[in-house]
Every structure is written in C-alpha cells, then in structure tokens.
C-alpha cells in the first residue's frame, strides 16, 4: 500500500468509501492517509459520509468549501445547490493545491470562474 511509504489523500467523493474499505482489508497506514472531499459531500445528509467513514475506520477526513455558491455560472452553482455530485476528486485536488502551493480558496475560485467561462463560450 502506498500509505506505508508516503502520505495519501483518497479523493473522489463517496466512491472513496469503497476504496477505504478495500484499503483496510489489504492493509494500509491510517496515520498516513486521509480522505479529501468538498463540503458538499460532508454536508450531504443523504450520503451519511462521516458516519460511514467512522464505521469503516478511524481516518482523517479533510473537506473544503470551494465557494461555488458565489459563482456567476449556473453550472457551477449547481454543485453548491446539491444538483451535481462531483465524484471526480475535486475536493482532494483543491486540498492538495492548498497544501502544496500558496493558493487560497479565493484564488482557486477565481480560476474556476475563469476556466468555466473559457470552456463554456
């Protein structure tokens, strides 16, 4: 398991619950591991994400609010409104960026807005 050699962030929304269960089965280092996701996953009462993590193992859960509710774009606001579930590692990618760079949520949000505008026009 990679977690025995380096720090690992599992990123991909609720799908990572299955990965965590598999990691526990094959053996991993929980101290070197965390699940990274957006606040949309953690705050989703239907997903019961934190409760399920606790049932599987004692592992850190890192979450971030990408502030998409402030977006000028309906497509991005849909995430904050609960209409879209990412499941693509967005939260983990944001967390990794915050940990490894001098980015802030505000800087990243501005980049999200810029890129969304670029690809949608």
Residue ranges of model-derived segments:
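Helical "lid/coupling" subdomains associated with nucleotide-phosphate turnover
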Residues: 1-121
């Amino acid at each position: 398991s990679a977690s025995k050699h380096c720090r690992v962030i599992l990123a991909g929304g609720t799908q990572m619950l299955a990965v965590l269960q598999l990691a526990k089965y094959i053996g991993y280092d929980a101290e070197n591991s965390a699940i990274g996701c957006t606040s949309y996953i953690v705050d989703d009462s239907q997903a019961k994400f934190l409760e399920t993590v606790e049932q599987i193992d004692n592992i850190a859960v890192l979450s971030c609010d990408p502030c998409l509710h402030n977006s000028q774009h309906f497509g991005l606001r849909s995430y904050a409104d609960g209409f879209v579930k990412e499941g693509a590692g967005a939260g983990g990618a944001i967390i990794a960026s915050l940990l490894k760079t001098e980015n802030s949520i505000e800087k990243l949000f501005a980049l999200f807005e810029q890129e969304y505008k670029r690809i949608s026009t």
